[in-house]
Amino acid sequence: MQLSPDDFHFRIDLWDDADKRIEQVIAFVSDLVVALAAYAAAVESKPGKRITLRQRARILDKSFT
């Protein structure tokens, strides 16, 4: 069975500097603990970049204000 992005509850996205479009989907994750760890690693590895952790349309955390 092949999985699709809809099979995962969480995603980590890298946004452009204008916060208008997603430049890269960093990860699709099904487990919250793994999603939080992946988000923390993404923020640490890309300082100053706009990164979000989302559960479907809901933003759980973001690396910018």
Each model region followed by its residue ranges:
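Charged, amphipathic alpha-helical segments
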Residues: 1, 30-41
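A general secondary-structure boundary signal
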Residues: 14, 25-26, 61-64
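A short, exposed loop/beta-hairpin motif centered on an aromatic-Gly-Thr core
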Residues: 22-32
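Sterically constrained small-residue positions within well-ordered secondary structures
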Residues: 3, 26, 42-44
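Short aromatic-glycine-(Arg/Gly/Cys) micro-motifs in beta-strand/loop hairpins
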Residues: 1-23
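Short, mixed-charge low-complexity intrinsically disordered segments
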Residues: 45-65
